[in-house]
Amino acid sequence: MNNKLSDFEKNLYKKLKSGKLEVKVSYRTFLCPYCPDNKKKVGLYVDILQHASGVGNSQSKKRSLTEKASHRALAKYLIKDLAHYATSTISKRLKARTSFIPAETGDAPIIYDDAQFEKLVWPWKGVLVNIPTTSTEDGRSCTGESGPKLKDELIRRGFNPIRVRTVWDRFGHSGTGIVEFNRDWNGLQDALVFKKAYEGDGHGKKDWLCGATDSSLYAWLANADDYYRANILGENLRKMGDLKSIYRFAEEEARKDQKLLQRLNFMVENKQYRLKKLQIKYSQDSVKLKYETEEKEKILRAYSEDLTGRQQKSTDHFNRIFADHEKQKVQLESQIKELEIRKLELAKREAENETQRKIVAKELEQNAAINSYVQLSALEQQKTREKAQRLAVDHKMQKEKLHKRIAALERQLDQKQELELEVQQLKSQLSVMRLVELDSGSEIVNKVETFLRDLSETEGELAHLNQFNQDLVVQERKSNDELQEARRALISNLRDMGLHIGVKRMGELDTKPFMKAMRIKYCQEDLEDWAVEVIQLWEEYLKDPDWHPFKRIKLETAETIVEVIDEDDEKLRTLKNELGDDAYQAVANALLEINEYNPSGRYISSELWNFREDRKATLEEGVNSLLEQWNQAKHLKS
C-alpha cells in the first residue's frame, strides 16, 4: 500500500516538475492545481505551501488517499523546485508541519529523506568566477579586483550581498570570489535571485562548465559540488560554512520558533497565574477597603451627629440664657419705672408732711437724749448675746467634724464662750451703772470697783484660754497635715499591688462592660479600635463640666436633700438603649464618684480604698496592710 502511494506521489511530482500542471501564476502568486474549487486555490507561496502540507498531513477520513498523495507531491515540488520564491514570513505552524508528512491513521509515516533535496552552503554563499586578473611585472603572482569593488558592482546590479571575498592562492589572485548573503530567509531569497539572474543571461554554473569563452563574470549558488571541490575555492567554503538543504533549514527554523513559542507560552501562563493572584488579592483588598470605608463613614457620621447635637444644645442653652437676660432686662426696666413713680410719690408726700416731719424730729431728739443710754446698753448686750450664740453654733459645727483628740479643746472653747459672755455682761452693766446712777454714792462706787476687779481677772483667764486655744489649733493642723502626707505616701506605695487595701481611681470609667456589650451586639472580632473611640468619647463626657446629669431629691426619712443620677438624661438614656445596663451602670458609678470626691474639677483622683468591704480605707488599715507586705517580703528573703 505504501509503495503504491509512493509511486503515485512520484508520478505526480514528475508531472508538476515537467510543467504539465500550472502552479506558478506570477512571480509572487501560486495556485493549487488539485483544488480548483477551494478558496485557497490562488495565493502567495507561503499560503499554497501551507495548504498543500495541511491536506497532505491531514488524518481526516474525509480526505481520500489520492488527494493526500497529490498534495504531498505539491508540497515536495514547492520545497525542492520553487523554494527561491519563499519569503521571510513563513509561519511557524507551516514549518512544523513540513518536518514530516504522516499517512493515514494506522499506516507508517512517510518521512522525507534530506538527501533528496539539494544541499547548499550555509550561511548562504555565491560563487564568482572569471574575475579579470593581471600578472605582476616579475610574473610570479596575479592581481585582480578587490572584494569591496565587486560588492559595489553587485549592488549596482540590484543584488543584496553583505560581503564579497576574493580567493587567493600561492600564485596570487585565483580569479574567483565568494559572495556572502544573510543567513536567514531574506538572505536565501537574495541568493536565489542572484542565482536566477546569472542563469537567466547565460552566465550560470552550467554555462561556465560547458566551456564559455565570454570574459564577463559567471556566478551561481554554492552547493555540495563546490563545497567538496579539491581546490582553494572548496577549501575556503568548508572553512566558512556547512552544507544544508532548504528543507533542513526550514525544519531548524521551525524548531527554533517552536522553542521560542513554548517559552513565550510559559511566560504567558506565568503572567496569567500572577495576574490571577493579583486579581484575587485586589478583590480581597477591595472588600476589606470597602468594609473599612463603611466603618469609617459610620464613625464619622456618628461623630458628626454627636457634634451637631452638642452644637444644637449649646445654641439652645445660649438662646435660653439670652431669653432669660432679655426677660430680666424687661423686669428691671419695669422695676425702675415703678421706683421712679414711687420716688415722685415720696417727694410729693415729703413736701406735704414737711411740717409734721419737723415736729416729729424735735420729739425724737428729745426722746433720743433720754433713751440713748438705755438703747445703747440694750443694743450692746443684744449684740453680745447674738455674737455669743453665733460663736456657739460655729464651735458646735466644728466640734462635730473634729477628732476625739480635741475634746479638751472643745471644753476650753466652752469655758471661753462663757467668760466672754460674762465679760460682755459686766461691761454692759458697768456702762449702764455709770450712766444712770452717777450720784448714788460710795456703795455704787464699791460695786463698780468690785466689777472692775472681776472683769480684769476674767479677761486674764480669757487671754490664757485664747493662747491655749491657738496652740491646740496649730497642733491639730500640724497633725492633720502629717496624716494627709502619710495618706498620700500610702497611696503612692500601695498602687497596683493587688491587695484588698489598695488605691482606687475615683471617677475612672470601667471599660469591660463597653467591650462586652459591643462584642455581643455587633458580633465582630476586630472592634478594639472602635470600642476605644467610644470609651474615649464617654471619658470626655465625664470631664465636661457643662454636663451635670443629676437631680435633687428629698429623703422621706429626713430633711436632707441629696443628688442622684437623672435617668431621663438624653445621653444616659441613649447609652442604656445602645449598650445595655452594664455600660450605663459603669458611667453612673463614675459620675457618682466624681460628684462625691471632685465635683468642681471633674478629673480622676486617687483614694485609699478597702476593696473587700467596698469603702474608703482608714489610715490604720493602710499602714497595717503595708506592714503585712513588708513582713511577708522579709520572711521570703530569710
Swiss-Prot record:
Coiled coil: 318-497
Alphabetical UniProt keywords: Coiled coil, RNA-mediated gene silencing
Pfam (any one): XH
Origin superkingdom: Eukaryota
InterPro entries for the chain: FDM1-5/IDN2, FDM1-5/IDN2_XH, XS_domain, XS_domain_sf, Znf-XS_domain
GO terms, biological process: gene silencing by siRNA-directed DNA methylation
General function of this protein: Acts in association with FDM4 and FDM5 for RNA-directed DNA methylation (RdDM).
Stated name of the protein: Factor of DNA methylation 3
Annotated organism of origin: Arabidopsis thaliana (Mouse-ear cress)
